[in-house]
Structures are given as structure tokens and as C-alpha cells.
Amino acid sequence: MWERKEGDMPTRIAIACDDIGFERKEELKRYLVEEKGAEIVFDPVTCPEEGVNTFARLADDMAEVIQRDVCRLGIYVCGTGIGFTCQINKHWGIRAVQVSDPYSAKRARLSNNAQVIGLGMRVNGLPAMEM
């Protein structure tokens, strides 16, 4: 989706998850930092237990981080990605979508300027890094 060029500032990204998405979030974080040169500026869930029943609070917190221009992009990983995207879309100026394939993720960003994607571990069999 985006490639970092020599001399570019790293893309700043917010990332969060619930207990279901914790392992995939950690994989994504490593991929984004090591392969894409991104900077993770919001990552409040440090163990699976911290993600239990927290999607609404995490959506509100991520929306605030984006609204304050700490970063412009966010990723949330949970069971379906639906509840989180519904909650974060309640915030002014936030455009979030639940995606289940790389093409939809790309079109959401290019056609709709989506800032946040929700990934569902229980509904998405594709490797999330492809998105």
C-alpha cells in the first residue's frame, strides 16, 4: 500500500487489539516496524488479558490519537473488526472500515480515505500483512 522512500519520515500508526487479536497484532507490529519502517505511536494492549472487553474504550482512545494528529492511520485486530469500527466511526472526522481482503483494504484507503481498518481474526483467513 505504501512504501517508505529514503529520507521520508516514518509513517506513524496506532495499533490495538482485543484478547482474540493479540498475537496477530504483535505480528503486524513487527512487520510494520521491521519491513515497512513504520513508527507505532499507540499500542495500549501489552498482553492478551489487557484486551478483554475493551474495544469501545480502545476505539475512543485511538480516535483521540488520530484527531490530535499524533498519527493518521490505525489498525485494530479482534474477532470480526465490526464492533470496533462502529464505535470509532462515532467520532468526528474518523473514517474506519472492517476489511477482509487486500483489495478492499486498498480501495478503502484510496477511494474513501479510510484512516483505520478493523481486521477480524474469526472471519479473515488471509494473512493480515497482505492488507
What is each stretch, according to the model?
Residues 1-8:
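Short, Lys/Arg-enriched N-terminal segments with co-localized hydrophobic residues
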Residues 14-23, 102-131:
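C-terminal binding/interaction regions
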Residues 16, 41-45, 74-78:
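Short, conserved beta-strand edge motifs with alternating hydrophobic and charged residues
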Residues 23-37:
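Short, solvent-exposed amphipathic alpha-helices that sit
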Residues 39-53:
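A short beta-strand-loop structural module common to alpha/beta enzyme folds
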Residues 40-41, 94-101:
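Short hydrophobic/aromatic-enriched beta-strand-loop microsegments
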Residues 58-97:
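Helix-adjacent hinge/juxtasegments
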